[in-house]
Curated annotation (Swiss-Prot):
It comes from Drosophila ananassae. Pfam families: Maelstrom. Involved both in the piRNA and miRNA metabolic processes. As a component of the meiotic nuage, plays a central role during oogenesis by repressing transposable elements and preventing their mobilization, which is essential for the germline integrity. Repression of transposable elements is mediated via the piRNA metabolic process, which mediates the repression of transposable elements during meiosis by forming complexes composed of piRNAs and Piwi proteins and governs the repression of transposons. InterPro entries: HMG_box_dom_sf, Maelstrom, Protein_maelstrom. Its main location: cytoplasm. GO terms for cellular component: cytoplasm; nucleus; P granule; perinuclear region of cytoplasm. GO terms for biological process: germ-line stem cell population maintenance; male meiotic nuclear division; negative regulation of DNA-templated transcription; oogenesis; piRNA processing; regulation of miRNA-mediated gene silencing; regulatory ncRNA-mediated gene silencing; spermatogenesis. It comes from the Eukaryota. The keyword Transmembrane helix does not apply. This is Protein maelstrom 1. The gene is mael1. It is found in: Cytoplasm; Nucleus.
Length: 424
């Protein structure tokens, strides 16, 4: 049965009992009998407050009847938020797919520009999704050109959320190690910084529809942080058109990597059956360039925290994209653009082909192999014989093995087998 509605008359009876000493000694039935004659003589204006109070009581009763979860949250509200989150995720994926497919249809995927962004923050509000920014970086990237430009700045918000100094200090000491306000470094004018970011994005995405937002990409777990930090900067901007920070749309870089890999393989005519989001996420999160030197800002380079530097992050993401897909597009990588400026040689060894076949290596690969063999000669007690036309190699211990990272990851290849292979 539905709950009984409150009546204005009973609201009046309860008030009369509370305010009159005589009414406190009467039962409900006696009080109703006594107040009935008084209620009949009251005008509509006098009865109005009691009738309004009864309606308000009905509303409160309905609210109290809402089902709650184990955290005391209204289930209907939680379900609404979950639906909105799911819709937001679907919209983000559709937008990413549309960007990639448009570039593919125009046969210009190699020159399409992507902007990677990252924020460091001091602290997060306990009850809301407000993050106080500490550092920002962005990089402009394309497959053909690699990293085309980088924007990086430290941020001094002036103050942190009251009562969260300890949390901010702990977060800083375990991650970016930036000094807290009022000793923070970098730009103090949030509105100016936001305008500078918009100006940087407008130069990259020149010719964009003015009614559409700028599109940037960041890690999956950093999407809410980046969105919140952009809103934080925008709210202090004097230009009302940027008030809500809606001019920048933040998308998932890990989903971008997945979609790009599938489309790149399709362009190359290679099967993508083994490519799924779990595979590309695992590759991205390995962060092969995590300890690359001299790509972070000066502060983090000097304090040995380059791993957490946002400038290092956005550059490492670009290197990851190049390392994962440039070979599929037959794009030669350039140090400082597609890969770090200082990179150790990556020697790749290939299995011996069937009898009668030959491995075809460019001259640079032959020279690399011969150089490596000479190095191994100095490190062992065996003599290696390198010579002939075409060059051949022999006299190597049969139990010596090397890894073949190019073709069979984590599979040992007998070095003797490789060295007796004819190189052409």
């Amino acid at each position: 049965m539905p709950p009984k509605k409150h009546s204005g008359f009973m609201m009046f009876v309860n008030e009369w009992r509370d305010n009159n000493p005589e009414g406190r000694n009467l039962s409900i039935a006696q009080a109703v009998s006594r107040c009935g004659s008084i209620w009949e003589k009251m005008t509509a204006q006098q009865r109005g407050p009691y009738n309004s109070g009864a309606k308000n009581a009905d509303v409160l009763t309905r609210v109290k009847k809402e089902r709650l979860n184990c955290h005391g949250q209204v289930l209907s509200q939680v379900e609404l938020e979950e639906r909105e989150m799911a819709e937001s995720q679907i919209n983000m994926k559709r937008c990413t797919e549309r960007i990639v497919m448009d570039a593919k249809r125009s046969h210009d995927l190699e020159n399409t520009k992507f902007v990677f962004v990252a924020f460091n923050y001091f602290t997060k509000a306990l009850t809301t999704d407000v993050y106080v920014p500490a550092e920002f970086s962005a990089s402009e990237y394309s497959f053909n050109e690699g990293i085309m430009s980088v924007y990086s700045t430290l941020i001094d918000p002036g103050q942190i959320i009251f009562g969260q100094g300890s949390d901010a200090q702990h977060h800083s000491s375990t991650t970016h190690n930036l000094p807290l306000p009022p000793n923070a470094l970098g730009e103090k004018n949030m509105g100016k910084l936001y305008r500078n970011i918009l100006e940087y994005l407008s130069k990259i995405q020149e010719g964009k529809d003015a009614t559409k937002p700028f599109v940037v990409f960041t890690k999956t777990d950093m999407v809410p942080v980046v969105k919140s930090c952009f809103r934080y900067l925008a709210c202090e901007n004097q230009d009302g058109s940027y008030e809500n920070g809606d001019q920048i749309q933040v998308l998932d870089i890990q989903y971008l990597l997945f979609i790009l890999k599938k489309e790149v393989l399709d362009i190359a005519g290679v099967s993508d059956e083994k490519i799924n989001l779990y595979v590309t996420d695992a590759y991205f999160l390995k962060d092969f360039f995590e300890f690359t030197p001299e790509i972070s800002c000066q502060y983090h380079e000097e304090n040995d925290r380059s791993k957490y530097c946002t400038q290092s992050l956005v550059m490492r993401w670009a290197y990851t994209f190049s390392d994962y897909m440039c070979s599929d597009l037959a794009i030669s990588v350039q140090p400082g653009k597609h890969i770090p400026p200082k990179t150790k040689p990556n020697y790749r060894f290939y299995r011996q082909p069937p009898a009668g076949d030959h491995l075809h290596h460019p001259l640079t690969c032959q020279q690399t192999i011969l150089r490596l063999l000479a190095t191994l000669t100095r490190k062992t007690n065996f003599h290696l014989s390198v010579g002939g036309e075409p060059p051949t190699v022999a006299l190597v211990p049969s139990d010596l093995t090397l890894w073949d990272p190019g073709i069979y990851p984590l599979t040992p290849v007998p070095f003797m087998t490789f060295l007796t292979t004819t190189l052409v």
